[in-house]
Amino acid sequence: MTVGIVAQRDNDRAMSLASTLCDRLRATSAAVVVDETTAGALGDHDAWEAAVPDSAPVDEMSACNLVVSIGGDGTFLYAARGAGSTPILGVNLGEVGFLNAIAPEEAVETVVAEVEHIQKTGSARTRAKPRLQASGDNWELSPALNEVVVQGERRGHGGGATVDVYVDDSLYTSGHADGVLVATPTGSTAYNLSERGPLVHPDVAGLIITGMADEMGTPPLVVDVDSEIVVELTDADSGVVVSDGRVRKDVVPPERITVSRAGEPVRLAGPPLDFFTALDKLA
């Protein structure tokens, strides 16, 4: 079997742990690959150079049997984009993390235990979490685990656009706003929360629609996870659709964007995160 490792860039703790993990995994007879950035960082440091395994682009991590993310939620989202349906286990390096459940001091033993379980049974112990697919006329973005944002070219005075939001063909809201955000429960603690959207427990089967500087004062709405959400963007020179804050598509209004549950969920491996314990770190 093959384990992929993606470590947070410019973080010595993450690279040191990645080096240790590479050494331990070799003792289990598992093959190890790291993403190209991690390989470069390990190779540039004398103490870690011997641990450098094969490297591969993050987009090829789906060929692994397990992917390990070491860092924060941003690193996890980056790794998850390439992992596809491959189970992914997140190691949290201390900041508020709602996707990374494993403490660094427990990481090596937890990963080794999961690898041995896969070697013995042929599959990982996982929990499926929905992702979002945003698409338009002849285009679609890579799936988002946290949120999809649709907005005008810029925010603030003189920016934004007219936004019409439909849920399963029924009009929910219409008017001027900076944009609209559609989040999964997993992403409710991220950008959604900063836009005054609600916290939603990750086990709830729903999607969250939150207006961004919405002049209509429309409250956020939680809909069924299988709802189809359509955002019509007009009255703006340009707009943008963003998946998990990283992958973006520039659009020219009028544009009709569909956001719905992606066909392939993310599969979380390892012990589950205690949601309410993680919430304490937000205070």
UniProtKB/Swiss-Prot annotation:
Disulfide cross-links: none
Group of enzyme by EC: transferase
Chief place where the protein resides: cytoplasm
SUPFAM superfamilies according to UniProt: NAD kinase/diacylglycerol kinase-like (SSF111331)
Keyword Amino-acid biosynthesis attributed: no
Known EC number: 2.7.1.23
Subcellular localization, as worded in the UniProt entry: Cytoplasm
GO cellular component: cytoplasm
Family from the record: Belongs to the NAD kinase family.
Biological role stated in the UniProt entry: Involved in the regulation of the intracellular balance of NAD and NADP, and is a key enzyme in the biosynthesis of NADP. Catalyzes specifically the phosphorylation on 2'-hydroxyl of the adenosine moiety of NAD to yield NADP.
Name listed for the protein in its UniProt record: NAD kinase
Organism expressing this protein natively: Haloarcula marismortui (strain ATCC 43049 / DSM 3752 / JCM 8966 / VKM B-1809) (Halobacterium marismortui)
Name of the gene this protein is made from: nadK
